[in-house]
Swiss-Prot record:
It is an enzyme of class 4 (lyase). Homodimer. This is Probable glutathione-independent glyoxalase HSP33. Catalyzes the conversion of methylglyoxal (MG) to D-lactate in a single glutathione (GSH)-independent step. May play a role in detoxifying endogenously produced glyoxals. Involved in protection against reactive oxygen species (ROS). Important for viability in stationary phase. May negatively regulate TORC1 in response to nutrient limitation. GO terms for molecular function: glyoxalase III activity; protein folding chaperone. The active site is at residues 138-139, 170. The gene is HSP33. It catalyses: methylglyoxal + H2O = (R)-lactate + H(+). Its EC number is 4.2.1.130.
Length: 237
C-alpha cells in the first residue's frame, strides 16, 4: 500500500524584523504540531522551503513559548521531527505527485518570500490539481498570492473562503507599522486581490480554521491541530 505523504513548507526568510532587532523566520510551534498530528494519523512527512534554508523566529523559540511533548520533540536530536527537518528539500527537488497534502506553515518570515515563492506555488497547485489538499496557517495563505488553479487558469482561491492571521493581530503584536514601512501585505489583502472571501476570527488568538473543498486554512499557531485535522478530513471527503 502506498504510504500517505504530506509536505510542510517553511519560509526561507530569516532576517531582522522586530523593533528590538530580533529576526523573524519559521514559527516553530506551527510545524511541530502539524508534523506530530500528521504522523499520528499515519502520514509520512517531509519539509520543504523555496531555497532549502530556514531559520527560527527568535520571538517564539521553544524555551520561552512551548513545553511538554512539543519541547521534547524539538530538543531531542534524534526525534522524528528533527530527522525530517534535517532532510529538508529545496522546492525544485520535490516531485508533487509524491504528496497528497501541501501544508504551508508560517511565521512573519512568510511575509517576505511566500508571495513570490514560485516553486512552492507550483508544487501546491500540482498537488491540488491531482486531487490533493492545500492547507495553510497563520501567514501561510500569503502563498496564495498569484497561486493559479491549473485546471481553470484562474487564481486558486478565487470564489473560496479562507482565513489567516488578521490585521488585528499584527496591531496587537506591535508590528503593523513595520508591515506598512516595509510594504508587506496581509492575508486579508491577498484574499481580496485574488477574489477570495476572508473570514476573520472573533479574536486573533482563537483556535479558528475553515474548510472550503480541498482548501483548508487556519488563523494562528493555536489552530495548528484543528487545521491539520481538517486537512486530513478534506483529503477523504
Amino acid at each position: 500500500m502506498t504510504p500517505k505523504r504530506a509536505l510542510i513548507s517553511l519560509t526561507s526568510y530569516h532576517g531582522p524584523f522586530y523593533k528590538d532587532g530580533a529576526k523573524t523566520g519559521v514559527f516553530v510551534v506551527e510545524i511541530l504540531r502539524s508534523f506530530d498530528t500528521f504522523e499520528k494519523h499515519g502520514f509520512e512527512v517531509d519539509f520543504v522551503s523555496e531555497t532549502g534554508g530556514f531559520g527560527w523566529d527568535e520571538h517564539y523559540l521553544p524555551k520561552s513559548f512551548i513545553g511538554g511533548e512539543d519541547k521534547m520533540n524539538f530538543e531531542t536530536k534524534n526525534s522524528a521531527f528533527n530527522k525530517a527537518l534535517a532532510r529538508i528539500k529545496t522546492a525544485n527537488e520535490v516531485n508533487a505527485s509524491d504528496y497528497k497534502v501541501f501544508f504551508a506553515s508560517a511565521g512573519h518570515g512568510a511575509l517576505f518570500d511566500y508571495p513570490k515563492a514560485k516553486n512552492l506555488q507550483d508544487i501546491a497547485s500540482k498537488i491540488y490539481a491531482n486531487g490533493g489538499v492545500i492547507a495553510a496557517i497563520c501567514h501561510g495563505p500569503l502563498l496564495f498570492d498569484g497561486l493559479i488553479d491549473i485546471k481553470t487558469t484562474r487564481p486558486l482561491i478565487e470564489g473560496k473562503a479562507i482565513t489567516g492571521f488578521p490585521l488585528e493581530g499584527e496591531i496587537a503584536l506591535g508590528v503593523d507599522d513595520i508591515l506598512r514601512s516595509r510594504k508587506l501585505t496581509t492575508v486579508e489583502r491577498v484574499a481580496n486581490k485574488n477574489g477570495a472571501k476572508y473570514l476573520a476570527p472573533i479574536h486573533p488568538w482563537d483556535d479558528y480554521s475553515i474548510t472550503d473543498g480541498k482548501l483548508v486554512t487556519g488563523v494562528n499557531a493555536n489552530s495548528s491541530y484543528s487545521t491539520t485535522i481538517r486537512a486530513i478530513n478534506a483529503l477523504y471527503s
